[in-house]
Amino acid sequence: VMFGVCGILGYKLNLLTGTLPPLLVVIGVQNAIYLINKYHEEYRKHGNKAKALTRIISRVGVATFLINFTTAVGFGTFYFTKTQMLEHYGVVSFITINLVFFINIIGIPALYSFLPVPSDKQIAHLDNKNINQFLGWVKFMVFNHKRRIYFWFIALTVLSTTFVFRLHPLAYMVDDVPRSSKLYQDLLYFQEHYKGVMPYEIVVRTHDDGDIGTFETLDKVNRLQRALKKYPEFSKPMSVVEVVCYANQTVNEGDPAFYRMPNALDLADIMARMPITKSNEKNQMMSGLIDSSRTGLRISYQIKDVGSTSLDSINKEVAVIIDRIFPKDEYAVKVTGTSAVFMKGNSYLFGSLGSATFWSLIIITITMGFLFPSIRMIVIAVIPNIIPLLVTAGTMGYFGVPLKPSTILVFSIAFGITVDATIHFIITFRRELVKHNKSVREALNGTIVEVGLSMIYSMVAICAGFFIFTFSNFQGTQALGWLTGLTLLTGMAANLFLLPAMILSLENSLNAKEELTEQVL
C-alpha cells in the first residue's frame, strides 16, 4: 500500500519513508491483535460466530478508528514543515495509516467469516496462566498500592529528567555508516592523511566591482589563511594566494624562502602573467580560483568530519576572523561548500523534525481533548504517554546517544503508538462503566483483564518487530530499534499501572463519574 501511494503521488523513497513499512506493519499487527482477541472473547461467551464478528466491528471498530486516526494526525503534522522530505513523509504516513485501519476492519472480519469457528485450542490463549497471573498482580498493585505506583513513576521521571539535560544534538557526515565498512575505512584514511574530504570554501567579493587581485585584497586573504592555520581540522588551502606564493618562489630560482606573498610591485608583475580566462586550458585552475571579472575569488579547503557541534563552533570562530580582516562595507565574504551545506541542512532538518514532533504531540493531545471533553481526563490520558518519552530521552542522555534525525524520530513514532493503548484502555473502561453501571473499581477490574491481554500481546509483537532493527548495519536504524522498544515497554507499564491508578484516584471525586462517562465523539 505504501509503495503504491508513493507511486501515485510521485514520491521517491528516502531515509524517512523507508521507516514506514515496519511502522505500518506494527500498527496493523496491533489492530489485528485487538480485533482477533475480541473476536475470540465474544465467541467464547455465546458461541455465535456471526454475532462475534459483528460485535468486534461495533465495539472495537470505533476505538480502532480513533486510535489510527489520532496516530495518522500525529504523523501528518510533518507535512507542515518546510522540508520536502518531511512533507512527503507526513502525507504518505497520514494516508497509509488510515488505509491500514480500513484494511483491518474490513479484511479481518471478512477473512474470519470464511474460516471455521475458533477451536478450543485457538482460544486457549485467553486463559494463559502466566499472563493472567501478571494481570492479577497488576490489579493487586492498582487497587492496594496506588501510592507505591505513584512513587516509582515519579522517581523514574525525576531520574530521567536529570539525564535529559545531558542530551545534545550531534551529527556527522557519515553518521550511520558501519564502522567496519570499506567506505568508512576509506574516509578515515583520507581524513587522516588529507585532512578529510569535506569541501570548505570561502568566497570573497568586492562591493564596488573593484579588482580582487590587488595587493591589499590578496594580503587580507593571506592573513585569513594564516589565521586558519591554527585549526588542525583544515587541509592546506588552494587559492590564488597560494598560486602567487608558488609563482614568487619560481621566479626566485625555487628558493623555499620566497614561498610567500611578494611585495606590491612583484605581485603586479606576477598577476599580469596570469590571464584569467576559461578558454585557455593552461588557466583552467586559475579560473576556478578567481572569476573572469576579477571581482571575486575562492579559497578552497578540505575539512575533517568533526561533527555538527564542532563544525558549528569552527564556523562561528571563522566568521569572527573574517569580520576582523574584511571590512563589511568593502567586501562580501561567504562560507560555502559541502560542509557548510551539510551544517545548514542538518540544522534545518533537525529543527523541522523537532518542531514537527512537538506539534504532533500537541495535535494528538488536542485530538484526545475532542475524544475526552474533560481537562482532567486529558491530563490523565497524556501523562502515561509523556513519561516514556522522558525515560527514553534520559536513557539517551545517560548512554551518550546524540539527537540526530534518525533518533529524534523515535519520539514521534513511540508517542503515536503508546497513545493508542491509552485511548483503547479509556474507551473500553468507559464502555464497561456505562453499560453495566459498575463502580469504578469493578469497571477497572474488567478493563484490565480485557485490554491488558491485548496490550501485552501487541507490545511484545511490536517490540519484537523493532528489535529486528538492532541487527541493521546502520547505527541510526539500530538506535531507532532499541530506543523505540524501550519507549513502548515503558508506555505499556504506564498504561497498565499508572493510568488505572490515576483513574481510581478520581473515584471519590464529586464529578468523577460524569467526566468518565461523558459521551465520546
Annotate each language-model stretch with its function:
Residues 20, 72, 195-197, 294:
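Short, solvent-exposed loop/turn segments at the edges of secondary structure
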Residues 219-222, 226, 316, 320, ...:
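Solvent-exposed, polar/charged alpha-helical surfaces in well-ordered, non-transmembrane soluble domains
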Residues 178-191, 275-284, 315:
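A general structural motif
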Residues 141, 145-270:
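Juxtamembrane segments of multi-pass membrane proteins
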Residues 1-172, 306, 316, 323-521:
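Membrane-embedded transmembrane helical bundles of large multi-pass transporters/channels
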Residues 200-205, 211, 286-319, 334:
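A short beta-strand structural signal in non-transmembrane regions
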